[in-house]
C-alpha cells in the first residue's frame, strides 16, 4: 500500500506543480523531432548530371535500335567531327535537364524500308528506360526528327568515303 500512496503523492505533487509525466514525454518527443528535421535540412544530399552525360546515354540508347543508321548533328557537330574520329555519341542529341526530369531531342538517319513510327516507339521506350535507370531522371519528352533516309549500303558507302577523307586529311596535316 505504501507504493500506491507514494505514487498518489507523487501524482498529486506533479499536478500541483504543473508537471505531468506524459506531457513532459510528449514535449521531449517533439523537441527530438524538431532537431532531426533541422539536421536533415542542414545535410541535404544532391545528385546531379550534366547535359552531356544525359546526351551520351540517350545517344547510345538510340543507336541500339534497329533501323537507326546514324544520328545527324548540326553545323557545330559536323565541324567537330571533321577534326575528330567522328565517333561522338552525342551527335544529333540535345537535352534539357532539370533536377528530376529531362527532355530529349534526337535527329536521326533512318534505314530505308523501316517503319519510322515503330522505330520512334522503340527509341522512346529505350531512351526513357536507360536515362531513368542510370540517372534516376524521369524523361518527360522525347522528340525525334528524321533528317534523312538511306539504304544500309548507301550509308556504308558514305561512311567509307568519309573515313577515307578523314584519313587523308590526317596524313596531310601530320596528325595520327
From Swiss-Prot:
Compositionally biased spans, kind Low complexity: 1-16
Top-rank taxon, per record: Bacteria
Region (Disordered): 1-43, 154-176
InterPro entries listed in its UniProt record: Asp23 (IPR005531)
Biased composition (Basic and acidic residues): 20-38
Family (UniProt): Belongs to the asp23 family.
Function, as annotated: May play a key role in alkaline pH tolerance.
Descriptive protein name: Alkaline shock protein 23
Species for this entry: Staphylococcus haemolyticus (strain JCSC1435)
Lineage, opening ranks: Bacteria, Bacillati, Bacillota, Bacilli, Bacillales
Gene (UniProt): asp23
Amino acid at each position: 500500500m505504501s507504493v500506491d500512496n507514494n505514487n498518489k503523492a507523487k501524482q498529486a505533487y506533479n499536478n500541483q506543480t504543473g508537471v505531468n509525466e506524459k506531457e513532459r514525454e510528449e514535449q521531449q518527443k517533439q523537441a527530438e523531432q524538431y532537431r532531426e528535421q533541422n539536421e536533415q535540412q542542414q545535410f541535404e544530399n544532391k545528385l546531379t548530371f550534366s547535359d552531356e552525360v544525359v546526351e551520351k546515354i540517350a545517344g547510345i540508347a538510340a543507336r541500339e535500335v534497329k533501323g537507326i543508321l546514324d544520328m545527324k548533328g548540326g553545323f557545330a557537330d559536323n565541324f567537330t567531327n571533321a577534326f575528330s574520329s567522328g565517333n561522338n555519341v552525342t551527335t544529333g542529341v540535345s537535352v534539357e535537364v532539370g533536377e528530376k526530369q529531362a527532355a530529349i531531342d534526337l535527329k536521326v538517319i533512318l534505314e530505308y524500308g523501316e517503319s519510322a513510327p515503330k522505330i520512334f516507339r522503340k527509341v522512346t521506350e529505350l531512351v526513357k528506360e536507360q536515362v531513368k535507370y542510370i540517372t534516376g531522371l524521369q524523361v518527360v519528352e522525347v522528340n525525334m526528327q528524321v533528317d534523312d533516309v538511306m539504304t544500309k549500303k548507301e550509308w556504308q558507302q558514305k561512311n567509307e568515303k568519309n573515313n577515307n577523307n578523314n584519313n587523308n586529311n590526317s596524313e596531310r596535316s601530320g596528325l595520327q
